Each structure stands twice: as structure tokens, then as C-alpha cells.
């Protein structure tokens, strides 16, 4: 699970930039098996982030219908995050992946790597994580007379991808306040 916290100045203070300042970004890993224990752990983590950062909005990237059909537990996860937000009296927003890409890159068809690069340009400190998103290719060897084959570094993609997705969602929400 990726999480990002963006800060937007109050009305009248003026925005230094279109998307405020990135206060925190992180990746949370859970060891609990799928089921109630995992849902409880995610909800506790979200409540902890809400207490620590006192946001005004909790936003997620909305899962597509296909992903919800393939993983019924995903619907439960979204419900738990929504419950944590509403329990704290906060607005809960789900943004489609296409809308996130459009607001970050100007195109609904941008790749994860393009989105990561745009966010790294905007937010200092994220550039070093770009290599872990999208098209990282590692040679896995070649046979005589054959082209070299590559594979995506799955641990980097799995680890940093959610963090960039979370920052992208935050950016998209803040950009919507303009």
C-alpha cells in the first residue's frame, strides 16, 4: 500500500505551486494473510496516518470493475479505508487511474514510468525512486544467435509503484482544488 500526504495552504495564503507540498510518502507492507486480519491491519494503519497527519481528505485510486471482480477482498479494503476516513469526519474520494494520469501527465494513456517521472520533476526527492517503476529492465542472459532477453524488476515495481500511485492520487486531488 502506498501512502502520500500533500499539504495545501489555506485560502488566502496562495499556492506556491499547483500541487502544494509533498509532506510524506511511504510504502506499507503487510504480513497478515488475506482476510479479516489484513483488513484490520490496513484500517489501523490508515487510522494511524489520519491521526498523525490530520488530513482534510482521504483519497484512493479507485479499483476498476475488473479488479474488483477478480478480488472481492479489494471491495472490503476500500470499504475499510472509507470507514476510517468517515469515522474521523473526513471527506473520502476515489479517483480513477485515468483521471490521475490525466491530471499528472496531461494524458489518460500515460505510462506508470511517465507518471513517476512527472511527479519526480514536481516533487524533490522522488527522482531516486523512478528507476523502480515501470520499465526497469534487467538482462537475464542470451543464447547463441538470439537477442538478449529482459525482465522487469518485479520487487522494485511492486514496492515503488504504489508509492508513486499514491503521490499521483494526492496530486490529482490537490490539482482539482485549483
Segments (PLM) and residue ranges:
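Phosphate- and other anionic-substrate recognition elements at nucleic-acid/protein interfaces
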Residues: 1-178
Amino acid at each position: 500500500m502506498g501512502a502520500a500526504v500533500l499539504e495545501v495552504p489555506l485560502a488566502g495564503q496562495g499556492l506556491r505551486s499547483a500541487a502544494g507540498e509533498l509532506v510524506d510518502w511511504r510504502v506499507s507492507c503487510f504480513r497478515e494473510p488475506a482476510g479479516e486480519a489484513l483488513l484490520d491491519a490496513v484500517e489501523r494503519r490508515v487510522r494511524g496516518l489520519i491521526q498523525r497527519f490530520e488530513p482534510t481528505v482521504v483519497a484512493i485510486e479507485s479499483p476498476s470493475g475488473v479488479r474488483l471482480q477478480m478480488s472481492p477482498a479489494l471491495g472490503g479494503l476500500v470499504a475499510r479505508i472509507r470507514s476510517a476516513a468517515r469515522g474521523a469526519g473526513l471527506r473520502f474520494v476515489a479517483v480513477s487511474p485515468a483521471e490521475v494520469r490525466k491530471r499528472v501527465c496531461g494524458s489518460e494513456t500515460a505510462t506508470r514510468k511517465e507518471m513517476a517521472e512527472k511527479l519526480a520533476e514536481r516533487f524533490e526527492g522522488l527522482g531516486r525512486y523512478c528507476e523502480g517503476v515501470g520499465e526497469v529492465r534487467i538482462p537475464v542472459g542470451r543464447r547463441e544467435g538470439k537477442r538478449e532477453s529482459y525482465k522487469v524488476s518485479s520487487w522494485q515495481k511492486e514496492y515503488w509503484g504504489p508509492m508513486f500511485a499514491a503521490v499521483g492520487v494526492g496530486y490529482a486531488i490537490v490539482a482539482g482544488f485549483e
